[in-house]
């Protein structure tokens, strides 16, 4: 969602952004495939848990990757009564998953340098949309991250930082 929002902002307000980093997404409409993650989180009765560790154990029944569970649990908060809650509005995200998956048609070409960083194992297929990306973002570069899926920054944080830092520091 962040990558799509950044691309829309860049296209609507040319010159506002000096460099653009887009992570594992293209300016196209995708089939909504994250709804199951959200439904799983939404189905948990958080009142049954006393610790984050207990919630992580429960989530491990659905999500094998520790790094992915840690990423999801960044949205898990505790209120003053020591009750857990999700920081994001899961119901709204589920209800609007189709709209979130769409990419609006915005005419014009970006003059912003853009880095499209993607996981080689990702189902989002950034390179399948290279021509579409180049049409809208002709100053784009592409950076694959080996052995990473869609959650590149979670799965390979050091490589992610290395690539992004190099791009942002370049002239």
What do the PLM-derived regions correspond to, one by one?
Residues 140-171:
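Catalytic active-site module of serine/aspartate enzymes centered on a nucleophile-bearing elbow/loop
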Residues 2, 6:
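Gly/Ala-rich beta-loop-alpha elbow adjacent to hydrolase catalytic centers
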Residues 25, 119, 147:
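Cofactor-binding loop segments of dinucleotide-utilizing enzymes, especially the Rossmann-like FAD-
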Residues 8-15, 135, 162, 166:
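Short, well-ordered alpha-helices that flank and scaffold nucleotide-derived cofactor binding pockets
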Residues 80-136, 141-144:
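Conserved serine/cysteine hydrolase catalytic core
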Residues 32, 47-101:
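Conserved alpha/beta-hydrolase catalytic His-Asp/Glu region
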């Amino acid at each position: 969602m962040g990558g799509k929002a950044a691309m829309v902002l860049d296209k609507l307000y040319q010159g506002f952004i000096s460099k653009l980093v887009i992570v594992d997404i293209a300016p196209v409409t995708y089939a909504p495939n994250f709804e199951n993650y959200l439904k799983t989180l939404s189905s948990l009765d958080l009142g049954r848990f006393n610790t984050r560790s207990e919630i992580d154990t429960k989530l491990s029944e659905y999500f094998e990757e520790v790094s992915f569970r840690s990423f999801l649990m960044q949205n898990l908060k505790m209120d003053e009564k020591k009750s857990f809650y999700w920081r994001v509005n899961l119901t709204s995200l589920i209800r609007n998953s189709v709209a979130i998956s769409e990419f609006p048609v915005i005419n014009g070409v970006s003059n912003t340098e853009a880095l499209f960083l993607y996981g080689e194992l990702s189902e989002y297929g950034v390179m399948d949309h290279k021509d579409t990306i180049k049409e809208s973002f002709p100053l784009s570069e592409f950076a694959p991250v080996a052995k990473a899926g869609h959650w590149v920054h979670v799965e390979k944080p050091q490589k992610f930082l290395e690539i992004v830092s190099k791009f942002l520091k370049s002239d």
